[in-house]
């Protein structure tokens, strides 16, 4: 008899119902739960899957380059980045009528195309690519890398090439290689590319493989490096009249500390970026030689952690036993990695718009909005995942004996204090912020807007002033010409930085007022509530006063039967599930704030945000309703336009979102009864009853239906906002 899906679980494979399929899919990547799994095979499978993941990423990026080279307008765009719309790829759709063909034929293309809002054109332009041939070469190289990683993944599954568990658990060696190799060497290589290829290209000098060895990136070559005159590399930078991509106004410096932005491109100086990467490379190359491996020199992480005992003995045994706990738990390691990656992704969102690194990207408003929103949503999902795996660690990998009285045990012991403090912070923020918003709404509704409670964010304004913003009149630190910090930095990076901070055309240190104060606290409410749900889920994952034996039921369980009331919805998975709703809510507020603030800034109408953002009706009417007008009337009997597809996606997003509630509100019994009725009808319908199934159809489990509901809710929510964001921004600014 042929083996049935899933091969990794004989118990599931023999299940006579459709549960076999859904549970099979749900546990396909839960390698720990598979039949015949060993620790060694677990590590090897994950290792091999990493190569597959990298292969997919390289294939995807190769596809981006290939399609732009084939169907885009990169070479035309390069000649006029501010006025030509970058094309992502062509569209072929049999449903398009003449109005659609005309609407989507733009950017100088012969037929319908999609416009790129990803910023890749600006990135490729900044790093020195100029022709379609450059793009094709890049695509082929990445395709080669993709194939290489697939072969490497397969190779490491061969018996002779499988690494041992001890190799995987050699934390010091892995850290050294990742710090030095992954971050250090790659940053150094990137500095090399910027200095040898991107910088000359920005100054009108074309460097490729043919002349790579003949063109000196700096007139004196490596002389200043070996002569100890490093400052020479920063002398004669590009002037403020430099035209990017030409020799007009260009300098010869390669590593600078100018601060601020290139006046024409409105992006960071390329020489500053090269300098930054060189510094990063140096730091990580040193960091990658810190840990003790075969040579008996350097730090032992275990020794550091064991020695890290708090003074006075008040806080227990500190970090004792942490090394083994972390090193033997993949979920702990994944939780730490996801937490770090989540924070970094959110930082990318914040820095890409405030300190744009790519030439002309700051003037492409739709791209700026799309990139900010994209990275904040990604960050939200990654951060919630960190807590999910933290909870799984507590259930599957945590050993109370091994961690007696250390920092982990003490976190669990005083979890009530942690959770109740978070709860208090959430309630405080929620009631006060909502109270202020609602008060202001009532005042406007009753015709007395002067009675609004408007609080100036003076502490935040003071911090902005300390960084050099003079608008508020605080004579402090860099905002004061007499301050020692101001005097010390005057000859270095300060002139460029101060010019940028006080320029109203960019997004660096935006001017803030009462509307910002309120929405800041609304976002703080969202962050604290999301954190409360996630932290509670992880700290209560092993057990609570209500259910002391919770860990025995695993990560996701619906309830412990009817005889034990109140055990529904309290699994660690349920906490994750609830937190995702709050995370989406929070990211929604963050992106609403960012987008509204910026479209009023870009339109030269900052007063609209300042006046309307202090009460809820202002947000609903002057941000959401006003900017969705083109989407609500997106296509009609009289024709269509370039926004029609976004109007349709706006509608479709709402539909997907609403479908989620069907799974979230009605439970298993309803669906089981419905399925049985449909099966009865199917078996009695001519022709239809020729089709049979081997598995008896049964309803999804409670946990699975929640997941399906959550996925629909999330996808619909994001689709709806993505369509709104792109249409409302591109409709205004093109």
Swiss-Prot record:
Pfam families reported in the protein's UniProt record: PsaA_PsaB
Localization per Swiss-Prot or TrEMBL: Plastid, Chloroplast thylakoid membrane
Main location: plastid
GO biological process, one term: photosynthesis
Family membership noted in the UniProt record: Belongs to the PsaA/PsaB family.
Binding residues for phylloquinone: 671
Functional description taken from the UniProt entry: PsaA and PsaB bind P700, the primary electron donor of photosystem I (PSI), as well as the electron acceptors A0, A1 and FX. PSI is a plastocyanin-ferredoxin oxidoreductase, converting photonic excitation into a charge separation, which transfers an electron from the donor P700 chlorophyll pair to the spectroscopically characterized acceptors A0, A1, FX, FA and FB in turn. Oxidized P700 is reduced on the lumenal side of the thylakoid membrane by plastocyanin.
Gene3D superfamilies: Photosystem I PsaA/PsaB
EC number from the UniProt entry: 1.97.1.12
GO molecular function, one term: electron transfer activity
Subunit composition and interactions: The PsaA/B heterodimer binds the P700 chlorophyll special pair and subsequent electron acceptors. PSI consists of a core antenna complex that captures photons, and an electron transfer chain that converts photonic excitation into a charge separation. The eukaryotic PSI reaction center is composed of at least 11 subunits.
Annotated organism of origin: Gnetum parvifolium (Small-leaved jointfir)
Binding sites annotated in the UniProt record for chlorophyll a B3: 662, 670
Positions that bind chlorophyll a B1: 654
Cofactor: record remark: P700 is a chlorophyll a/chlorophyll a' dimer, A0 is one or more chlorophyll a, A1 is one or both phylloquinones and FX is a shared 4Fe-4S iron-sulfur center.
PANTHER family, alphabetized: OUTER MEMBRANE PROTEIN, OMPA-RELATED, PHOTOSYSTEM I P700 CHLOROPHYLL A APOPROTEIN A1-RELATED
UniProt superkingdom: Eukaryota
The protein's name in its UniProt record: Photosystem I P700 chlorophyll a apoprotein A2
Annotated positions binding [4Fe-4S] cluster: 559, 568
GO cellular component: chloroplast thylakoid membrane; photosystem I
Keywords, alphabetical: 4Fe-4S, Chlorophyll, Chloroplast, Chromophore, Electron transport, Iron, Iron-sulfur, Magnesium, Membrane, Metal-binding, Oxidoreductase, Photosynthesis, Photosystem I, Plastid, Thylakoid, Transmembrane, Transmembrane helix, Transport
Transmembrane segments: 46-69, 135-158, 175-199, 273-291, 330-353, 369-395, 417-439, 517-535, 575-596, 643-665, 707-727
Catalytic activity field: reduced [plastocyanin] + hnu + oxidized [2Fe-2S]-[ferredoxin] = oxidized [plastocyanin] + reduced [2Fe-2S]-[ferredoxin]
Recorded topology in the membrane: Multi-pass membrane protein
């Amino acid at each position: 008899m042929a083996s049935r899906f899933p091969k990794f679980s004989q118990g599931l494979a023999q299940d006579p119902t459709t549960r076999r399929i859904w549970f099979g899919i749900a546990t396909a990547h839960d390698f720990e739960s598979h039949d015949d799994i060993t620790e060694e095979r677990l590590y090897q499978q994950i290792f091999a899957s990493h190569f597959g993941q990298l292969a997919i990423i390289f294939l995807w990026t190769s596809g981006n380059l290939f399609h732009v080279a084939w169907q885009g307008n990169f070479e035309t765009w390069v000649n006029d980045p501010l006025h030509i719309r970058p094309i992502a790829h062509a569209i072929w759709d049999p449903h398009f009528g003449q109005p659609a063909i005309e609407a989507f034929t733009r950017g100088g293309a012969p037929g319908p195309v999609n416009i790129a809002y990803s910023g890749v054109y600006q990135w490729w332009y900044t790093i020195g690519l100029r022709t379609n041939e450059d793009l094709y070469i890049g695509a082929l190289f990445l395709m080669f890398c993709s194939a290489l990683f697939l072969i490497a993944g397969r190779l490491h599954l061969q018996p002779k090439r499988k690494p041992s568990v001890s190799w995987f658990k050699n934390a010091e060696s892995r850290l050294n290689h990742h710090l030095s190799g992954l971050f250090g060497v790659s940053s150094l290589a990137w500095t090399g590319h910027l200095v040898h290829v991107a910088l000359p290209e920005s100054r009108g000098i074309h460097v490729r493989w043919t002349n790579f060895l003949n063109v000196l990136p700096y007139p004196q070559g490596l002389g200043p490096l070996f002569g100890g005159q490093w400052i020479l590399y920063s002398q004669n930078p590009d002037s403020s009249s430099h035209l990017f991509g030409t020799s007009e106004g260009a300098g010869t410096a390669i590593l600078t500390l100018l601060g601020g932005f290139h006046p024409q491109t409105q992006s960071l100086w390329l020489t500053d970026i090269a300098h930054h990467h060189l510094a990063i490379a140096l730091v990580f190359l040193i960091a990658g030689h810190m840990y003790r491996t075969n040579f008996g020199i350097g730090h032992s992480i275990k020794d550091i952690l064991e020695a890290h005992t708090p003074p006075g003995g008040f806080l227990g045994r500190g970090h004792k036993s942490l090394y083994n706990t972390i090193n033997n738990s993949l979920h702990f390691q994944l939780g730490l990695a996801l937490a770090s990656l989540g924070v970094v992704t959110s930082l990318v969102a914040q820095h890409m718009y405030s300190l744009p690194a790519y030439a002309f990207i700051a003037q492409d408003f739709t791209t700026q909005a799309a990139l900010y929103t994209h990275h904040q949503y990604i960050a939200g999902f990654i951060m919630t995942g960190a807590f999910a795996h933290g909870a799984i660690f507590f259930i599957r990998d945590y050993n109370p004996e091994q961690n007696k009285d250390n920092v982990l045990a003490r976190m669990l012991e005083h979890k009530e204090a942690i959770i109740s403090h978070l709860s208090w912070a959430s309630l405080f923020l929620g009631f006060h912020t909502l109270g202020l918003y609602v008060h202001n709404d009532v005042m406007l509704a009753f015709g007395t807007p002067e009675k609004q409670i408007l609080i100036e964010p003076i502490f935040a304004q003071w911090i902005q002033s300390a960084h050099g913003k003079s608008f508020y009149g605080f004579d402090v630190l860099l905002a004061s010409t007499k301050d020692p910090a101001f005097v010390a930095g005057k000859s270095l990076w300060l002139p460029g930085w101060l010019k940028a901070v006080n320029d109203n055309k960019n997004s660096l240190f935006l001017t803030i007022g009462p509307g910002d104060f309120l929405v800041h606290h609304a976002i703080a409410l969202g962050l604290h509530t999301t954190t409360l749900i996630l932290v509670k889920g992880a700290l209560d994952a092993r057990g609570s006063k209500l259910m002391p034996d919770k860990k025995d039921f695993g990560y996701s369980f619906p309830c412990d039967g009817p005889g034990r009331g109140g055990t529904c919805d309290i699994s660690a998975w349920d906490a994750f599930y609830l937190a995702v709703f709050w995370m989406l809510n929070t990211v929604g507020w963050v992106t609403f704030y960012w987008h509204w603030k910026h479209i009023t800034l870009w339109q030269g109408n900052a007063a609209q945000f300042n006046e309307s953002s202090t009460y809820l009706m202002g947000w609903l009417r002057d941000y959401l309703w006003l900017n969705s007008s083109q989407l609500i009337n997106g296509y009609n009997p009289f024709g269509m336009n370039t926004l029609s597809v976004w109007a349709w996606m706006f509608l479709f997003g709402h539909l997907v979102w609403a479908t989620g509630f069907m799974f979230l509100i009605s439970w298993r019994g309803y669906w089981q009864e419905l399925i049985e009725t449909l099966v009865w009808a199917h078996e009695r319908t001519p022709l239809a009853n020729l089709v049979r199934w081997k598995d008896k159809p049964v309803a999804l489990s409670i946990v699975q239906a929640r997941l399906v509901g959550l996925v629909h809710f999330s996808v619909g929510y994001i689709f709806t906002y993505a369509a709104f964001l792109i249409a409302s921004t591109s409709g205004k600014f093109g």
